[in-house]
Amino acid sequence: MNELTTFDPFHSDLLYIKRVKSKPLMATRSRIGIELKDGSILSAYHHWDGYPQWLGRILETNYNTKEKVSELIDGGDMSSCWNDTVWGKDRTDGQKYGPEYYSARGEDCPPRLDKDMEEFFSDNEEYSYIFRNGNWFAYDMHQFEDMVAPESVEIPSGALAV
């Protein structure tokens, strides 16, 4: 087996894994959205490390204005919003860290517009984040529990050491 393979379906409806040195690594899938004036939500899919202790802190620390959030989401679906490489190559955008968009490897994955929170929450990610009125709100989608509504969760304070 190759040391690094493409994403393998582990369970088609629940999660995907990546294998590094024959050991599975599980993705924590999430969706990052910004609420628009009419209540609709423009969002992008985020594949790796979507839990509040990592992604929530990255969003609050580095994507904390409407302009920064809009720019992040405008790039479309991504592997990660905070990476020091772009698909294994050094960054050429002048940033030490930044998004790793699927479009950078030729995929067409633009942002998605949902008419309301109910539609936004119907995507089967494990966590969802909404930037609303200058603040981030995180939700545990209880992906692996039947019939459990999304639950608001706290984003831990403090920046991550990088």
Features from the language model and the residues they span:
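N-terminal low-complexity, intrinsically disordered "leader/linker" segments enriched in small/polar
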Residues: 47-53, 58-69
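Low-complexity intrinsically disordered segments
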Residues: 61-162
